[in-house]
Amino acid sequence: MADHITFFRMKAQPGKRQAVIDHFAQDEEFTRESKGFVRAIVVTSSDDPDEVMAGVRFDSTENYNANSNDPQTGAWYQGLRALLASDPDWFNGTLARELSR
């Protein structure tokens, strides 16, 4: 069973980039305890002060979907969405190859 990866690109409302970044910290304990969670990253654009990208990795699509369908995750997402200028662009996939040190 391959790991599930989701990337999402977001455009923060003007002046809300740090609030978007901070919002990711609000649910860290819940996320860490989620079954199958491996890692999450948040990246800011070097070119656009309002653009943020994030990625999350779970050990399976099943565990990712269970987390996504959890009401606590839904509430967290609604809080995030309130800080964004529009809906995120999503990319869901299966880990095909990885290189790490």
Region roles according to the model:
Residues D3-M10, A40-D70:
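Short, well-ordered beta-strand segments in beta-rich or mixed alpha/beta enzyme
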Residues M1-I5, V38-D50, W76-R101:
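Glycine-rich beta-strand-turn "strand-cap" elements at beta-sheet edges
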Residues Q26-R39, R57-F91:
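An amphipathic, aromatic/His-enriched active-site/gating alpha helix that lines ligand/cofactor pockets
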